[in-house]
């Protein structure tokens, strides 16, 4: 995946320029369609270059309960022709409202660790005693076909993706208005016990300390306003 993202037309032109500098001063260069032509004295070199139009990776993260999933679903619906979602894998228990292969690929710990050993993930992380990861098979297919990819992942995974693909990733952090409001939202889900909710709040405080790594930080106070702000961010990045 990295080579496809890195080798754009500009990169190839730079490579050709480097080749020219190593040849005689009589060398000339022309770029015709996908063919780069070097003329070194009487020698003509034609490089047939396949230009791959790859998309961008939008990584959306934030504490559990902040509203990431709902926002991402609305973004995908709004940008039907421009944005694709990569379904993550996890070892956490499936919620009543979730569907296998739609919300997540649900794995047991042994299955997930086999995938880690097989280098099957773009990124993976342990969060609240469960594994989460983005499958390469999902992500690479979308990006290689020129699609823009949106990932809804934990902040550790977000930083891994940025490190691997620094020029192609846009990091967006969704922040709660306050920890008190986040607690209210977590309780409203009514699918976790009090200890789990408290653990999520502690984790949320740690995550909010990482916002300096993100290009955009959006506070989800009112859903419609937050969605409009995210739509504006993506439109600007598409262009």
UniProtKB/Swiss-Prot annotation:
UniProt-listed Enzyme Commission number(s): 2.7.4.8
InterPro entries named among the record's database cross-references: GK/Ca_channel_bsu, Guanylate_kin-like_dom, Guanylate_kinase, Guanylate_kinase_CS, P-loop_NTPase
Binding residues for ATP: 62-69
GO molecular function terms noted in the UniProt entry: ATP binding; guanylate kinase activity
EC category: transferase
Keywords carried by this UniProt record: ATP-binding, Cytoplasm, Kinase, Nucleotide-binding, Transferase
The keyword Transcription is assigned to this record: no
Similarity annotation: Belongs to the guanylate kinase family.
NCBIfam families named in the record: guanyl_kin
Name recorded for this polypeptide: Guanylate kinase
Organism for this UniProt entry: Mycoplasma pneumoniae (strain ATCC 29342 / M129 / Subtype 1) (Mycoplasmoides pneumoniae)
Gene: gmk
